[in-house]
A protein has these predicted regions:
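Glycine-rich phosphate/pyrophosphate-binding loop and the adjoining helix
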Residues: 68-127
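Helix-loop-strand module that forms the ligand-binding subsite of alpha/beta enzymes
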Residues: 1-77
Length: 127
């Protein structure tokens, strides 16, 4: 979900609220969940949105997969490095507001691939 005005977008909130019937039956209990977030700013309150996604997963009794990467926070780090935004709860992506989807920084794309593999590997271990 994108972060928009301090939280996940209204479209995601609509989806989340529509899951209440599944919650009553615990239909997603022990399912694997993961999340990512994008905003135009480097921080942009992405953590708030990820915690909302993680909380929804927890309410459903799900198993949340963290990012599992150390941050790239040395002086030599660039936007081409894995986890250069320093996420831990889930994937963080930053896209300038005037950029096209083809201009997402390579480090964010590579981090997304790494996170997708992690979610798949953990899902396979639990299967």
């Amino acid at each position: 979900s994108p972060t928009y005005m301090c939280s996940p977008s209204w479209q995601f909130k609509k989806f989340a609220e529509a899951t209440s019937k599944i919650w009553f039956t615990q239909g997603w209990k022990d399912k694997v969940f993961g999340g990512f977030n994008n905003s135009a700013s480097f921080n942009g309150d992405k953590q708030v949105s990820l915690i909302a996604l993680q909380t929804l997963a927890s309410q459903h009794g799900g198993i949340w997969v963290s990012l599992g990467l150390l941050p790239s926070n040395s002086k030599d780090a660039t936007r081409k490095d894995l986890n250069n935004l320093g996420g831990s709860v889930g994937l963080l992506v930053q896209s300038p507001s005037d950029a096209s989807v083809d201009e997402i920084p390579q480090g964010d794309l590579d981090t997304a691939v790494s996170y997708g593999k992690r979610v798949a590997e953990i899902t396979a271990k639990l299967a």
